[in-house]
C-alpha cells in the first residue's frame, strides 16, 4: 500500500530539487541487463543495470522519464529501500515514478545485499558483513552521471528506515557529493565527521512507530511470537 508519508517525503525532496544488493544465489528483482553502460540516450529509459563491486554483483534500477529536458543537465534522486525490502518495493512505496515524470528528474533505486544496507552499527546482514555500501552508492552515482545528462550540483538522497540511515551516512561522509537529504524512519548511526559540510536534511518520524522510536535512536524489536 502506498503511504502518505512517502508521498510527502517525495514531494519535499523534489521541491528542494526544483529550487536550486541482492545475494548472488538469489534472483534479481526486475531482471538485469548485465554489467556495462547504456548508450547516451536520455529519455524514456527504465532499466536495471548491474556491476561487480568488491567481488559481488550489485544492481540498481534507473528511470529516465520522457519529460527529461534534453537541452539541460537535470537533477538525480537516489531512493534507498529499507531493511527486508527491495528496490521494487521502494519504488512502489515512494511513487517517484510519477514525481520524476512530472518534473523531468532522473530517479535511481539501488538494491541492497540480502535486502539490507551497511549504514552503521545496526542491524542488518550488510552491516554484519561490513559491506562498503557507501562506496557502492558513490559508484552508482558515477555511472549514472557518466551515462546521462546530470546536474552534479543537484544530486539528492531519500530512503526508508535502513535506507534513511544510509542516506544520512552518505551525507555525513560525502557532503561534497549530495545537495540534500529527506528521509523517513531512522537516524544517523555514526558520529558526525569533523570535515562535514552542512547540507539540508529533513528526517521524518512517526509518533506511533514502535520500532524506530521518535524519542531517541534506540531500536525496539517487538516480540512477534
Residue ranges, per PLM feature:
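A domain-start/cap signature at the N-terminus of enzymes
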Residues: 21-76, 102, 129, 158-184, ...
Amino acid at each position: 500500500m502506498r503511504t502518505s508519508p512517502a508521498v510527502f517525503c517525495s514531494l519535499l525532496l523534489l521541491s528542494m530539487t526544483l529550487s536550486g544488493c541482492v545475494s548472488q544465489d538469489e534472483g534479481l528483482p526486475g531482471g538485469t541487463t548485465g554489467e556495462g553502460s547504456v548508450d547516451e540516450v536520455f529519455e524514456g529509459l527504465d532499466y536495471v543495470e548491474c556491476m561487480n563491486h568488491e567481488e559481488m554483483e550489485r544492481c540498481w534500477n534507473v528511470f529516465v522519464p520522457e519529460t527529461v529536458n534534453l537541452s539541460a543537465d537535470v537533477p538525480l534522486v537516489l531512493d534507498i529501500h529499507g531493511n527486508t525490502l527491495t528496490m521494487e518495493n521502494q519504488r512502489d512505496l515512494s511513487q517517484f515514478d510519477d514525481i520524476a515524470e512530472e518534473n523531468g528528474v532522473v530517479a535511481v533505486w539501488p538494491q541492497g545485499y540480502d535486502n539490507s544496507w551497511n549504514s552503521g552499527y545496526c542491524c542488518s546482514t550488510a552491516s554484519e558483513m561490513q559491506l562498503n555500501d557507501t562506496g557502492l552508492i558513490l559508484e552508482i552515482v558515477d555511472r549514472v552521471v557518466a551515462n546521462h545528462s546530470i546536474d552534479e550540483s543537484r544530486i539528492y538522497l531519500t530512503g526508508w528506515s535502513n535506507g534513511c540511515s544510509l542516506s544520512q551516512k552518505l551525507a555525513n561522509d560525502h557532503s561534497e557529493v549530495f545537495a540534500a537529504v529527506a528521509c523517513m524512519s531512522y537516524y544517523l548511526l555514526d558520529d558526525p565527521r569533523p570535515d562535514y559540510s552542512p547540507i539540508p536534511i529533513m528526517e521524518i518520524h512517526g509518533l506511533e512507530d514502535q520500532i524506530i522510536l521518535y524519542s531517541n535512536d534506540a531500536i525496539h524489536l517487538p516480540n512477534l511470537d
